Amino acid sequence: MRIGQIAVGRKRSLRIQFSPKRVLDMPILRAEIPEPWRPRRLRRAARALRKQGVKRVLVPAGFAQWDTLESAGLGPVETGEFCRARAPAVALAALTGAHIRPEGATVVLRGERVTRAMRMSALKLCPEVKNLLIAAPVGGAGLQAELRREYGVPALEDAPGRAPDLAIHFAPSAGGGARIVDLSGNNPRMDHFSFALREQTLPEDCEGLPLLAALWETGRLDPAEITVFTDFHS
């Protein structure tokens, strides 16, 4: 599925200009739209992108006119699967930001069922943290048994009496914790986190997280290349 980009047009230009580009080796169709971005102008660009097979677009940080783009058939690059795949790095960054050593931390993974992302997160976090709690009605017991076989230590079941230092939610949950990171949904809010590449710089004319998600889902990004930072304290 082709990905597009909405970008600010050149100064003194009155026309919307379309051009194929490569962003970190990913092909995109870029629409440069002169400011101010009035709804009619955005719709015109969106319709032209749709005719070229574009359904999802990258936009500048702070873009607030999704209703206009969606009315023309364009949507965002969803980031949920990418964020859940990066849950171990997010968890460790959150603990570091809260000045909690992982080897002394209790972390709970919560979801309606054990997904691939939850299982992989549990396998990576279990040897890193003191206690790993699993809260998943479907598949939770099986995952705990797998962790016991793999690491020889129990992965505990989440319970009201236990107060984890950090809770990672893979689906909407009412469970508590000293710190909660909600990774559920198509586009989880990651206000306290930032993602960067170890050896490359992300372009400044589009939001970084959707770009990373697009690179990851198209197989152009090794998760080992990504670092996660946070100012998450509560």
Regions found by a protein language model. Give the residues of each.
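Short, well-structured alpha-helical segments in soluble
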Residues: 41-53
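N-terminal basic/disordered segments at the start of proteins
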Residues: 1-24
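Adenosine-phosphate binding glycine-rich loop
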Residues: 181-234
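A glycine-rich, Thr/Ser-enriched phosphate-binding loop motif common to dinucleotide/cofactor-binding enzymes
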Residues: 75-92
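Glycine-rich phosphate/diphosphate-binding loop of Rossmann-like nucleotide-binding domains
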Residues: 98-162
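Short, charged/polar "capping" segments at the starts of alpha-helices
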Residues: 13, 63-69, 116-120, 139-145, ...
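Electropositive, gly/pro-rich neighborhoods at or near active sites that engage anionic ligands
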Residues: 31-41, 56-70
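Short, well-ordered secondary-structure micro-motifs within conserved domains or adaptor modules
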Residues: 1-7, 157-192
